[in-house]
């Protein structure tokens, strides 16, 4: 959805998601008995805090779990400039005693390959900015156009060409503001996943290796008939990377501890959690001689891996090791059973 970025002068509360307009009056700054709809503040509080107002699109932009901006975006975005968003801006602007309105933010989806959808969203945001200026004579100084830039997780996929596509987006923003007679805002982008995903590699130790005969109608992801799939279990899974189970995200894997046989077999790398959806890599060809104790490397796990890791089934979250020209060092230590037990409350 699109979000209104506002900053509240009272300090102390964590960032909050406001899902309905009425919530703006229901947030109480820490250390104060006042609500944001009132003018009372705690003496000495002056730092800014960011709040966000979500505007949910009433459309499925592409995928039921991970939206990718597409042709439905233009229709869905009409609400941004034509109704709810403008009403929210006006309501916030009327509360200048406790709120400072600094800009608008949009998020249109994830793993988007080019700037086309971002350009559509940007045009709507600039139109919203112009409409608000025309009615309230206030120029929103900042516009955050979000992120969701695609990353190549498997062979054959492409990452977004940031230089080319963000250049197109910046040109479009300049063009539409000239056409609207508006000064260009400060533009922000969010390239987090695009930046950090390729920097992470997760290492797993192989456990049981089990070949399973498939029916005569079975095919691989390329459509080729297959008669056997080898299930390769590892000592991790959905507790350290929830994306395959949550979104159906695809990854690949490589044998990392030795050179395997030239002959390969179709494999599915599965986790240790005894869940049908606990899949690390849905389909990959690995050396036919893969065996217990081998190390598999799953690349491009630097984003939404460790940050969404959990103690599912009381699994321990693995360590994070930084590797550079100067060598390797532990950045985050491995969890232990004592860590889990430390949360227990003794009588």
Question: Positions of the model-derived regions?
Answer:
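Active-site-proximal beta-alpha core segment in soluble small-molecule metabolic enzymes
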Residues: 7-142, 172, 177
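C-terminal helical cap(s) of enzyme catalytic domains, especially alpha/beta-barrels
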Residues: 24-29, 158-166, 316
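Short, small-residue-biased leader/transition segments that mark boundaries at the very start
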Residues: 1-6
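Glycine-rich beta-strand-to-loop/alpha-helix junction loops that act as flexible
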Residues: 108-109, 143-150, 189-194
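A glycine-rich, aromatic-flanked flexible loop/lid motif
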Residues: 97-99, 140-147, 227, 261
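Short glycine/threonine-rich loop-to-helix capping motif typified by GTGT followed
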Residues: 113-120, 152-165, 196-208, 281-286
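Generic structural signal for well-ordered, non-membrane alpha-helical segments
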Residues: 81-85, 118-122, 162, 166, ...
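Charged (often Lys/Glu-rich) extended helix/loop segments that serve as interaction or gating elements
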Residues: 174, 178, 182-347
């Amino acid at each position: 959805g699109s979000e209104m970025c506002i900053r509240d002068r009272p300090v102390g509360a964590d960032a909050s998601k406001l899902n309905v307009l009425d919530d703006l009056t229901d947030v109480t700054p820490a250390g104060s008995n006042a609500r944001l709809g009132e003018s009372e503040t705690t003496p000495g509080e002056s730092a800014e805090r960011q709040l966000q107002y979500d505007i949910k699109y009433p459309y499925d932009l592409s995928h039921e779990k991970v939206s990718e901006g597409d042709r439905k975006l233009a229709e869905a975005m009409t609400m941004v400039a034509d109704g709810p968003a403008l009403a929210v801006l006006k309501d916030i602007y009327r509360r200048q005693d406790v709120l400072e309105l600094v800009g608008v933010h949009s998020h249109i989806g994830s793993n988007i390959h080019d700037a086309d959808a971002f350009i559509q969203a940007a045009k709507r945001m600039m139109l919203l900015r112009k409409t608000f200026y025309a009615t309230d004579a206030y120029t929103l100084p900042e516009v955050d156009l979000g992120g969701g830039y695609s990353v190549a997780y498997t062979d054959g996929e492409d990452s977004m060409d940031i230089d080319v596509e963000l250049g197109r987006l910046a040109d479009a923003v300049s063009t539409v503001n000239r056409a609207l007679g508006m000064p260009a805002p400060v533009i922000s982008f969010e390239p987090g996943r695009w930046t950090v995903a390729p920097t992470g590699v997760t290492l797993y130790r192989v456990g049981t290796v089990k070949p399973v005969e498939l029916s005569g109608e079975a095919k691989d992801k390329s459509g080729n008939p297959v008669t056997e799939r080898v299930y390769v279990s590892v000592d991790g899974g959905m507790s350290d990377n929830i994306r395959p189970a949550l979104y159906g995200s695809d990854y690949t894997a490589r044998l990392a501890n030795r050179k395997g046989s030239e002959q390969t077999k179709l494999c599915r790398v599965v986790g240790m959690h005894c869940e049908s959806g606990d899949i690390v890599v849905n389909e990959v060809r690995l050396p036919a001689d893969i065996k217990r104790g081998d190390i598999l490397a799953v690349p491009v796990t630097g984003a939404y891996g460790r940050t969404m890791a959990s103690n599912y089934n009381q699994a321990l979250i693995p360590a994070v090791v930084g590797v550079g020209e100067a060598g390797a060092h532990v950045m985050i230590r491995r969890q232990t059973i004592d860590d889990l037990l430390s949360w227990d409350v003794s009588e």
